[in-house]
């Protein structure tokens, strides 16, 4: 059964966290971060926040540390901005979907280049 409320809450959390990243967070470890999705459990106690970041592996690790250390800040600000009885616990996870998509695109491009032409 699909629960519409966690989906709506996830969308709202995505908007609010993105806004907080732009205007409120002052951690230098958190650079060019994009929140790609937020998945909220049906009981509304856990939200997985998926993000991408511009940079190499070292930048990703620093961003992860920065986001984890800012989790109390995010929860406090979300509690002020949203009318919810309980603000979900936030778990930040790097979104590998973009890398996966780029890899598939690269493989398809290689296949097209290696394909002999039928002229």
Swiss-Prot record:
Gene3D superfamilies recorded: 3.30.300.20
Residues in the signal sequence: none
Database matches in SUPFAM superfamilies: Ribosome-binding factor A, RbfA (SSF89919)
GO CC term (a single one): cytosol
Location (main, coarse): cytoplasm
Domain of life from the UniProt record: Bacteria
GO molecular function per UniProt: ribosomal small subunit binding
Cellular location(s): Cytoplasm
Coiled coil: none
Gene Ontology terms describing biological process: maturation of SSU-rRNA
Primary role: One of several proteins that assist in the late maturation steps of the functional core of the 30S ribosomal subunit. Associates with free 30S ribosomal subunits (but not with 30S subunits that are part of 70S ribosomes or polysomes). Required for efficient processing of 16S rRNA. May interact with the 5'-terminal helix region of 16S rRNA.
Subunit structure: Monomer. Binds 30S ribosomal subunits, but not 50S ribosomal subunits or 70S ribosomes.
Family to which the UniProt record says this protein belongs: Belongs to the RbfA family.
PANTHER family according to UniProt: RIBOSOME-BINDING FACTOR A, CHLOROPLASTIC-RELATED
Protein's name in the database: Ribosome-binding factor A
Organism (species): Syntrophotalea carbinolica (strain DSM 2380 / NBRC 103641 / GraBd1)
């Amino acid at each position: 059964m699909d629960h519409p409320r966690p989906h709506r809450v996830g969308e709202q959390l995505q908007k609010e966290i993105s806004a907080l990243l732009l205007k409120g967070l002052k951690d230098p470890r958190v650079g060019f971060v994009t929140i790609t999705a937020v998945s909220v459990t049906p009981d509304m106690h856990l939200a997985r926040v998926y993000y991408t970041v511009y940079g190499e592996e070292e930048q990703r690790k620093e961003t992860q540390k920065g986001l984890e250390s800012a989790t109390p800040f995010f929860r406090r600000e979300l509690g002020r901005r949203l009318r919810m009885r309980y603000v979900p616990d936030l778990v930040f996870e790097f979104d590998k979907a973009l890398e996966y998509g780029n890899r598939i695109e690269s493989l398809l491009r290689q296949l097209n280049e290696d394909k002999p032409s039928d002229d």
